[in-house]
Amino acid sequence: MTNLIIFLFPIRKKSQRFEFKGYKLNAVTKNWQSYDNLYRMTCRALKSRIQDFDVKELSGGFFSAVYLIEADERKVILKIGPNRDVRIMRHELEYIPTEAEMLHKLRNIDILIPKLITLDDSGEICNEPYFFMSFIEGTPLSETEVTGYELDAIKYQVGRITRQICSNPAPYFAVPGLPASITTRNSRFVLTLVKWLLDDAAEKQISIPFIKPTELLNFIDSYSHTLDEAIPCYAHTDTWDGNLLIKDGKLNGLIDFAAILYADPLMSHDFHDFNAKPLDSFLRGYGKTSFTENEMIRIQIYRIWQRLGMIVERGYRCYDDSNIYAWVLDKFVKEVKKMKALGYINRLL
């Protein structure tokens, strides 16, 4: 048992952070609007005829067009879904309505998140759904220099927030807004997520390194009993450094709630991010500092799912920089090798 734990979670002293400084992440999914449209959308949302109006495209984010809007001295954020003619991944089909719904549902939780102002899916001004939310001051952690002490405090807070989100039970496992994903079994849900990614990859002829799709699905299916130990809750699967807003060295806000799933709490991002193991500071904040063997197996499966998603995403976004986060290919292979070794170890036990 000890060897298995060391194999899955080797010790690493420092947080491994991936930064995107200097990038303007322009993707085909970003549905930029004209100045006139933005003005009309804002007047409708704020229910006033605005006199002083200014807009700024925000360069962060990997999916939606996002604007910082100043309207008569009020700052708000506008987020717009992709044009319907743009092909997006299966799990992304309801991203904008889902994020608006999650902001509304989580509004009474004591965490630092934007407040939903309005969702408009009428198509009367903009051809796709969009929503306005409150502005939170701060710079993404991915673009901020912090001390080791500050980073520990930030990740501790992320752990506390993650626990608060996960404390909300979900009625079933699902991608919110996508009925085809609904199931009462976590194993069926995880297989659906992975199969959707593999189908998305096949349709765009995106190569998945080192492992055949059927082999990956069969391996995950072989751990159905382990996956099915999970109980569904709200799980934020994208609390990476780019979604953490920092002010004066402290966490001042968490953004991007489109990636909340009804899922295993261990599917929350910081359990399976790019560190060799979950950070101690995060785990202390979450209130869980040890794992059973089955929990570690589930985390390992989620590490592969998360990296697979990034590989497929690169082929759908068509970023200006075609090599952006190409490093994830090697990370995926590394996790698959761990998975294969894990299967071999278990056959010997």
Model-derived segments and their meaning:
Residues L8, F18-A27, G343-L349:
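Phosphate/pyrophosphate-binding loops and the adjoining catalytic core of nucleotide-dependent enzymes
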Residues K13-K14:
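Polybasic, lysine-rich low-complexity intrinsically disordered segments
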Residues S34-Q51, E124, T144, Y156, ...:
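An alpha-helical support segment within catalytic cores of ATP-dependent transferases
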Residues K56-R188:
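ATP-binding pocket architecture of kinase catalytic cores
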Residues E229-A235, W240-Q300:
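Active-site Asp-x-Gly
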Residues Q300-V312:
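Hydrophobic alpha-helical segments that form the core
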Residues G315-D330:
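Hydrophobic/aromatic-rich alpha-helical bundle segments in the mid-to-C-terminal region
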